[in-house]
């Protein structure tokens, strides 16, 4: 008998051990309803997969039988749940979690969920809300709660399969009926509540409904993990539900929870689902329609088009739609198209003479892509975007989002092209992470409620969820806000990436159109673009000491201006036209007497004195301190002007000392092309510079040592820009 007894005992132990190996979560099933795979559903699945939940989606492929945006509905969810529970009704150990999916995400795993469910000591636990819905008349029938939320929420509940089967057994309603009202009436019936054994998650230990509780919920960063913390009850909910107006807050939380972004790891999902373009030849690249919008007077439009041309994307796979609202920019647009329009697959221009409204033009651009099935992407770019990264388009395509914008900010400011949150009336509100995203302390791909100025939209999205031909009208909102409101209404996510610096936004606040070349005045508002357009590309080499010549003792020669800077400064002066007479009487200067007169126009005559001083401070002062060690300058000046030399007007300049500590003399046109002769001779050293280079400046000491003269111009017209610095 003993051997048989031992075998029986061993078998019992093995069976017990096998049961002990079974994980509690093996008896957990998550049911949800999703009639189509929206971005919200994919987010729900991703958070569930992170914690290894078993999920079954009900209703995929069905029509949703309630009109979007209506307050009632949800009966379809009850119908689908009732049918799904038929095969589980007798599984007493099976725990079923039922939750919405489009606006829900998991913050913790099955083990914690089941632990908290069992601690509730009820067979069915519903989420609880601060607000009663849909029938406020039922408020008095609710049991009084001393601590916690009082009202039932149908967006999430958990229970044993037999009890849930009893819960939905009486459902005979229509798909358009309210599921919340159905469950509420069962809960408010004391007999049914006791029979099914229902309670509410009053303190949000399992479920967190954001509606009516936005101020209670904050992010809690743990080591390598992010939770939502309820401050009112000091709880860490397992599921977060953000229905209705709180979806935007769920989107914000979903940028982090459960571990999509942490301080330790950064973005953990930014490289998921990418569309790689590596190794793809030009012929196989997707077709992109580029929409360009010039809606107001904008600086550096010519530079905008140059940057467009520098994109590393074949023009034969790009189509252009340009809406130019401004007569002021008509010549620049036409010049660009005349020179480069034929390089693109197609071009459509809507000019200022058409007088098309901003929203209508943007609708037209999007619709051109929508109606053409070969249009894979629509790339909308406003003219105030400085797209400085040539790989911008490829990088955005690579992220593989329906709608995505790159972060763009204004120079030195927190102003950007996205909002991290919206106020109650739908306007700007600053999210907790806004500054960190703008300043690059948090880097990733962010789900945000508002983008503008530049974005990439998939053509398939325009032909699908965004198929409305009027995306840019919504109530009385401006086109940018209307666009975002319409996208949010379709439950399409708008993403913002700050993984790469693709460019910046121009400041338009102080832009004026009263000059011939208005960009010259933008050195304060848009210094980066001013530098790109007007400062010589080799200036940085000169600053590093690699491109500085010394043609005469203590005379330095280095590049400073671009060809464009030289041309525009000359044209601006000629456009102004009030050249001095070149005699000693000069009312423009203190005392009214000029000892060494030239035919010139002063910078202050064209309102350019502040801008010129900024130029001297930013670009001349650093060179001075390098070339004359120990001397530091604030680049003060009394005289800064453009001189014109002509054989029949004033061909040369008599020997003189400059009234300065040092002088700069910038050649504004080309010897041998625009004029002959000219140059500068330093008499004490018997040293002449006879072939000044356009855009290069001479820098030399002024009074005392460098006695010099202007050599005769024998043909054409010579222009130079001169400053007497630190007089």
Swiss-Prot record:
EC number: 1.14.11.4
Gene Ontology cellular component list: catalytic complex; collagen-containing extracellular matrix; endoplasmic reticulum; endoplasmic reticulum membrane; extracellular exosome; extracellular space; Golgi apparatus; rough endoplasmic reticulum membrane
Segments forming domain Fe2OG dioxygenase: 636-727
Enzyme superclass (EC): oxidoreductase
Signal peptide: 1-18
Annotated membrane topology: Peripheral membrane protein
Subcellular location: Rough endoplasmic reticulum membrane
GO biological process, alphabetically ordered: collagen fibril organization; epidermis development; peptidyl-lysine hydroxylation; response to hypoxia
Substitution effect: residue 446 to G: In EDSKSCL1; loss of enzyme activity
Gene3D superfamilies in the cross-refs: q2cbj1_9rhob like domain (2.60.120.620)
Catalytic residues of the enzyme: 718
Main location: endoplasmic reticulum
A GO term, aspect molecular function: iron ion binding
Residues given in the record as Fe cation binding sites: 656, 658, 708
SMART domains in alphabetical order: P4Hc
Catalytic activity: L-lysyl-[collagen] + 2-oxoglutarate + O2 = (5R)-5-hydroxy-L-lysyl-[collagen] + succinate + CO2
Keywords: Dioxygenase, Disease variant, Ehlers-Danlos syndrome, Endoplasmic reticulum, Glycoprotein, Iron, Membrane, Metal-binding, Oxidoreductase, Signal, Vitamin C
Job description of the protein: Part of a complex composed of PLOD1, P3H3 and P3H4 that catalyzes hydroxylation of lysine residues in collagen alpha chains and is required for normal assembly and cross-linkling of collagen fibrils. Forms hydroxylysine residues in -Xaa-Lys-Gly- sequences in collagens. These hydroxylysines serve as sites of attachment for carbohydrate units and are essential for the stability of the intermolecular collagen cross-links.
Disease: Ehlers-Danlos syndrome, kyphoscoliotic type, 1: A form of Ehlers-Danlos syndrome, a group of connective tissue disorders characterized by skin hyperextensibility, articular hypermobility, and tissue fragility. EDSKSCL1 is an autosomal recessive form characterized by severe muscle hypotonia at birth, generalized joint laxity, scoliosis at birth, and scleral fragility and rupture of the ocular globe.
Subunit structure: Homodimer. Identified in a complex with P3H3 and P3H4.
Protein's UniProt name: Procollagen-lysine,2-oxoglutarate 5-dioxygenase 1
Originating species: Homo sapiens (Human)
Biological classification of the source: Eukaryota, Metazoa, Chordata, Craniata, Vertebrata
């Amino acid at each position: 008998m003993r051997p048989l007894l031992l075998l029986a005992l061993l078998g019992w132990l093995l069976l017990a051990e096998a049961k002990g190996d079974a994980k509690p979560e093996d008896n957990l099933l998550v049911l949800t309803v999703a009639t189509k795979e929206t971005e919200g559903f994919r987010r729900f699945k991703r958070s569930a997969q992170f914690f290894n939940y078993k999920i079954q989606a009900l209703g995929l492929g069905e029509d949703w039988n309630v009109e979007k945006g209506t307050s009632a509905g949800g009966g379809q969810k009850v119908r689908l749940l009732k049918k799904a529970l038929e095969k589980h009704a007798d599984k007493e150990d099976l725990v079923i979690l039922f939750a919405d999916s489009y606006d829900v995400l998991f913050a913790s795993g099955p083990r914690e969920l089941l632990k908290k469910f069992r601690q509730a000591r009820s067979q069915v636990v519903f989420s609880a809300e601060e607000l009663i819905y849909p029938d406020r008349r039922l408020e008095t029938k609710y049991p009084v709660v001393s601590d916690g939320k009082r009202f039932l929420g149908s967006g999430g509940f958990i229970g044993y399969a037999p009890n849930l089967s009893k819960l939905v057994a009486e459902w005979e309603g229509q798909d358009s009926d309210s599921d919340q009202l159905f469950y509420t009436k069962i809960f408010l019936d004391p007999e049914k509540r006791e029979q099914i054994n229902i309670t509410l998650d009053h303190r949000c230990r399992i479920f967190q409904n954001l509606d009516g509780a936005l101020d209670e919920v904050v992010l809690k960063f743990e080591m390598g993990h992010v939770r939502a913390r309820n401050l009112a009850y000091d709880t860490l909910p397992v599921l977060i539900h953000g229905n209705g107006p709180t979806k935007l807050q769920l989107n914000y939380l979903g940028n982090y929870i459960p571990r999509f972004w942490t301080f330790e790891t950064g973005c953990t999902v930014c490289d998921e689902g990418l569309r790689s373009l590596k190794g793809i030849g030009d012929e196989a690249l997707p077709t992109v329609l580029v929409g360009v919008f010039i809606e107001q007077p904008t600086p550096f439009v010519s530079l905008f088009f140059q940057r467009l041309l520098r994109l590393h994307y074949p023009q034969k796979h790009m189509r252009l739609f340009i809406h130019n609202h401004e007569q002021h920019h008509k010549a620049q647009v036409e010049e660009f198209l005349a020179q480069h329009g034929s390089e693109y697959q197609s071009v459509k221009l809507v000019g200022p003479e058409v007088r098309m409204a901003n929203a209508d033009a943007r609708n037209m651009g999007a619709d051109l892509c929508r109606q053409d099935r070969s249009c894979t992407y629509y790339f909308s770019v406003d003219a105030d975007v400085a797209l400085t990264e040539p790989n911008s388009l490829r990088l955005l395509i690579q992220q593989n989002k329906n709608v995505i914008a790159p972060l763009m900010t204004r120079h030195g400011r927190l102003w950007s092209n996205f909002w991290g949150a919206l106020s109650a009336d739908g306007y700007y509100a600053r999210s907790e992470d806004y500054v960190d995203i703008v300043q690059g302390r948090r880097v990733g791909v962010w789900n945000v409620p508002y983008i503008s100025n530049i974005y990439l939209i998939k053509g398939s999205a325009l032909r699908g969820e965004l198929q409305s031909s009027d995306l840019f009208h919504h109530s009385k909102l401006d086109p940018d806000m209307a666009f975002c409101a319409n996208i949010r209404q379709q439950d399409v996510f708008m993403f913002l990436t700050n993984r790469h610096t693709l460019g910046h936004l121009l400041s338009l606040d102080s832009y004026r159109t009263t000059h011939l070349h208005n960009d010259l005045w933008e050195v304060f508002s848009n210094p980066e673009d001013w530098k790109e357009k007007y400062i010589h590309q080799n200036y940085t080499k000169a600053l590093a000491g690699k491109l500085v010549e010394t043609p005469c003792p203590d005379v330095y020669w280095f590049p400073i201006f671009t060809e464009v800077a030289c041309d525009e400064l000359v044209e601006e002066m000629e456009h102004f036209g009030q050249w001095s007479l070149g005699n000693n009487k000069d009312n423009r200067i203190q005392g009214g007497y000029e000892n060494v007169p030239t035919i010139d126009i002063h910078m202050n005559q064209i309102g350019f004195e502040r801008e010129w001083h900024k130029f001297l401070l930013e670009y001349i002062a650093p060179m001075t301190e390098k070339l004359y060690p120990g001397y530091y300058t604030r680049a003060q000046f009394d005289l800064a002007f453009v001189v014109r030399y002509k054989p029949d007007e004033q061909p040369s300049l008599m020997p003189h000392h400059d009234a300065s500590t040092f002088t700069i003399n910038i050649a504004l046109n080309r010897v041998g092309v625009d004029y002959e002769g000219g140059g500068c001779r330093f008499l004490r050293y018997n040293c002449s510079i006879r072939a000044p280079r356009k855009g290069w400046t001479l820098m030399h000491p002024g009074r005392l040592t460098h006695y010099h003269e202007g050599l005769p111009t024998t043909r054409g017209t010579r222009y130079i820009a001169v400053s007497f610095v630190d007089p």
